């Protein structure tokens, strides 16, 4: 067991969840100077860029169970390492959500039941999109995210630019899908806040595991076929 890789994944996912969800909970609607949808999108993207440069050489900087599964499906990551990576990612997201909850609770009028950056469908979708619309959005967005990750980290891709391409992709994904699902494409990121919201957020959490995992696997398989990469697994392959 390589505990350093798992610790890096936990820390990286903590940062993604704390910075990304924190921007939504604390800064998005701040009177007069709130960062809004664009600011939240940038926060998620920048969290990935910064962590990719910080821990990409340690764990590959997956920060996301769908990325880990997608890389395995694409032949870039050993299947036997999926479970410990996912556990580390979920733990990091939960700790981030707990810290964010403590901080946000210090503001008067804070109500965790209003969403706490949770993902949802139907009445709990920001735009009240249907379950099917939200499911398709998460599948397609995660599929394209993995496609970009696979391409940006390919051996023939320009060296050193993968974190930027991947971070910008996540910004684009959020710009499009925040109104639909509040943007997941990451089961760990969805799990942390949902645990504190409870109720509807936990009841709808299944979609934000199933759809991203399907999308991630599809993205990995499609890029593997398209690029005609070797079928052998490369241990420790990087996501960013």
Curated annotation (Swiss-Prot):
NCBIfam families listed in its UniProt record: MIP, PRK05420.1
Gene Ontology CC: one annotated term: plasma membrane
Entry keywords, A to Z: Cell inner membrane, Cell membrane, Membrane, Repeat, Transmembrane, Transmembrane helix, Transport
Organism phylogeny: Bacteria, Pseudomonadati, Pseudomonadota, Alphaproteobacteria, Hyphomicrobiales
Membrane topology reported for the UniProt record: Multi-pass membrane protein
Catalytic activity: H2O(in) = H2O(out)
Protein name: Aquaporin Z
Locus of motif NPA 2: 186-188
Chain positions of site Selectivity filter: 44, 174, 183, 189
One term of GO molecular function: water channel activity
Chain segments annotated as transmembrane: 10-30, 35-55, 82-102, 131-151, 160-180, 194-214
PANTHER family, sorted: AQUAPORIN TRANSPORTER, MIP17260P
Domain notes: Aquaporins contain two tandem repeats each containing three membrane-spanning domains and a pore-forming loop with the signature motif Asn-Pro-Ala (NPA).
Organism in which the protein naturally occurs: Bradyrhizobium diazoefficiens (strain JCM 10833 / BCRC 13528 / IAM 13628 / NBRC 14792 / USDA 110)
Self-association state and partner proteins as the record states: Homotetramer.
């Amino acid at each position: 067991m390589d505990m350093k890789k798992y610790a890096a994944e936990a820390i990286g996912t903590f940062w993604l969840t704390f910075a990304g969800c924190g921007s939504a909970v604390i800064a998005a609607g701040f009177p007069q100077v709130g960062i809004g949808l664009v600011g939240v999108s940038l926060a998620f993207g920048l969290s990935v860029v910064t962590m990719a440069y910080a821990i990409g050489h340690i764990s590959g900087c997956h920060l996301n169970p769908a990325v880990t599964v997608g890389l395995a499906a694409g032949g870039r990551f050993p299947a036997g390492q999926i479970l410990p990576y996912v556990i580390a990612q979920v733990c990091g997201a939960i700790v981030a959500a707990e810290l964010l909850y403590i901080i946000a609770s210090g503001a008067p009028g804070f109500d965790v039941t209003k969403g706490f950056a949770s993902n949802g469908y139907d009445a709990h979708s920001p735009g009240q999109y249907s379950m099917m619309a939200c499911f398709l959005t998460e599948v397609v967005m995660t599929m394209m995210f993995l496609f970009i990750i696979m391409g940006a980290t390919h051996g023939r891709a320009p060296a050193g630019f993968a974190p930027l391409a991947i971070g910008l992709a996540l910004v684009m994904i959020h710009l499009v899908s925040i109104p639909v699902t509040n943007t997941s494409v990451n089961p760990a990121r969805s799990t942390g806040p949902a645990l504190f919201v409870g109720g509807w957020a936990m009841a709808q959490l299944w979609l934000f595991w199933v759809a991203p995992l399907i999308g991630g696997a599809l993205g990995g398989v499609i890029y593997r076929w398209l690029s005609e990469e070797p079928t052998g697994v490369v241990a420790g392959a990087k996501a960013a």
